[in-house]
Regions:
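Structural and coupling elements of P-loop NTPases
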Residues: 1-534
């Protein structure tokens, strides 16, 4: 997570390359990154949806969820947070923590989520790692502790990194990491960082505290275990750094994620109700009753593709699960692991892992799939209501039905926008998180469903109100030979209850024939629809 443009997608590219998932590091400018594969992302050069990118490191599978940084797509971040065990907050060495960094930290606080920091772009001009580190510590507290620090040479050229825990330095040679001696001018600083880490983990237990005050040095293994516990207990936020373009720091970050971030079975147990209304625990155990949570949906003219996380048990190919919300069975059919847009069919998705399935009929983002013997519904995803509205209209007539169908499909994958018809202004309205959000939706309508639309400011439905009673009169005279026509009526208008209408007749002696009365009533009602002034 982090602010837009801070380098999250580029970092994922580097990690995938270092882990051997890809044979080259994609670039956003070239439109060939693994996570920004949507045509809109390639065109706009930024992420608009959460992408899944798994890697394996030291026998540990890590599912990376690359989230958008622009606030218009905040709902994608919320969906990712719902299934993540921990968060990596990215901030740049150039500007330090931004508004997106603050929001990411606030999300972690709200979800009680373990977190680490990564300071990106440390090799770029005007980048200052230690200034950014100081800002992070000042803003988020002493729990922010550096694990990896950069090695600079000459005019602040980044040539490598030092791991303060194991006290080893490395530089990159091509795609390989090579160990080098720690520069003499950095040894004191590395010792200080390591001592600060020891002090932090000493607070985790009385035994560690006694050993710390006795002057006993912790081993590397004890320090790693202590940092992991501190991260899990939310009292420590380790800081890593690097540059995605050269891979400096990427090895250390993968090792840090595997060593310090909690695994799915360490996540707090979820509590929910079964079909009898009894509270039950959902434990991340492979032999438990199958329970999967759908956190993302991709929809087009061909159907849905649903991303899910296995919360308990395992999901097997062709098994049938129950959607308690929709009270419907769903056959899992073919199931896949996903890396960007690439899918690989597998027979089973294990507990704690992320997979995808196609052609679910009733299941939407935020739904739970479980066994028929234990129907459960986990807490869904809380999406902020839309706050920006525009009027949407087709460029050509006759495609209104295609627009409605397309928007309904798009809402399957993006529940953060809404549509409605305003009967007063006769406009179709679309509401989202901002102008970029709505512009992306319109582009998707064109690309996926072949419908071009325009957005305009909605008409303001001004309301008029009669302030006081008034009497008006009208006369009709027509003389063209023979019998002439003459009419003279008076009408009284007066204030009435808000939104209500009362039509009364005060005709005496049939002076105005009754067959004219309904036409007068109808005319008044039509005038009320549009108003007199507005």
């Amino acid at each position: 997570m982090g602010h837009g443009g801070d380098g999250k997608t580029s970092l994922v590219e580097s990690l995938l390359n270092i882990a051997g998932v890809t044979d080259r590091v994609g670039k956003i400018a070239d439109g060939n990154t693994v996570c920004d594969f949507d045509p809109e992302e390639i065109k706009r050069k930024f992420s608009i949806s959460t992408a899944v990118a798994p890697v394996e490191w030291n026998g540990c599978k890590i599912n990376l969820l690359d989230t958008p940084g622009f606030f218009d797509f905040e709902s994608e971040v919320q969906c990712a947070l719902r299934v993540a065990e921990s968060a990596l907050i990215v901030a740049t060495g150039k500007s330090g923590p931004g508004v997106g960094t603050e929001k990411a930290w606030a999300h972690c606080e709200e979800h009680a989520m373990p977190r680490m920091f990564y300071i990106s772009k440390i090799d770029e001009e005007n980048s200052d790692y230690y200034n950014s580190l100081h800002k992070l510590q000042k803003q988020f507290g002493v729990s922010v502790a550096p694990i990896v620090v950069p090695i600079f040479e000459g005019n602040r050229d980044t040539v490598g990194i030092v791991d303060c825990v194991i006290r080893k330095a490395y530089r990159m040679e091509g795609n390989k990491r090579v160990e080098i001696p720690i520069p003499d001018n950095m040894k004191d600083r590395i010792d200080q960082h390591r001592a600060a880490l020891c002090e932090n983990i000493a607070e985790l237990s009385e035994d560690l505290m006694e050993r710390y005050f006795a002057g006993e040095e912790f081993s590397d293994e004890e320090l790693i275990a202590g940092i992991r516990q501190g991260v899990k207990d939310l009292v420590l936020a380790p800081v890593f750094c690097g540059t995605a373009a050269t891979g400096i720091g990427s090895y250390a970050l993968l090792k840090g994620i595997a060593d310090y971030m909690p695994s799915p079975d360490e996540k707090p147990v979820e509590i929910c109700e079964d079909e009898k209304g009894e509270l039950i625990e959902i434990n991340c155990t492979p032999n438990g009753s199958t329970c999967a949570f759908v956190f993302k949906t991709v929809a087009d003219q061909y159907g849905r593709f649903s991303y899910f996380k296995v919360m308990s048990g395992e999901v097997k190919q062709d098994m049938t699960l129950v959607n308690k919300r929709a009270d419907a069975n769903e056959k899992m059919g073919h199931i896949f692991t996903v890396c960007g847009k690439k899918t690989t069919e597998v027979p089973v998705i294990g507990c704690g892992d992320i997979g995808a399935v196609s052609k679910l009929v009733t299941t939407k983002t935020g739904d739970t799939l479980s066994m028929s013997v234990r129907k459960v519904e986990l807490e869904s995803i809380e999406i902020a209501p839309p706050c920006y509205t525009q009027a949407i209209a087709p460029k050509v007539k006759g495609v209104e039905e295609k627009i409605s169908t397309g928007l309904a499909r798009l809402r399957d994958e993006d529940p953060s926008f809404d549509t409605e018809f305003n009967p007063e202004t006769k406009q179709h309205l679309i509401s989202g998180a901002g102008d970029i959000h709505l512009d992306v939706l319109c582009s998707k309508l064109k690309d996926k469903f072949g419908v071009e639309v325009t957005l305009t400011d909605p008409i303001v439905p001004y309301r008029e109100k009669i302030r006081k009673a008034v009497t008006v009169e009208g006369k009709h005279k027509k003389q063209s030979g023979g019998h002439g026509q003459y009419g003279h009526v008076k009408m009284e208008f007066a204030p009435y209850a808000e939104g209500d209408y009362l039509f009364q007749e005060k005709i005496f002696g049939g002076s105005v024939p009754k067959n004219f009365h309904p036409a007068v009533d109808k005319g008044i009602r039509e005038a009320m629809e549009h108003g007199v002034l507005a």
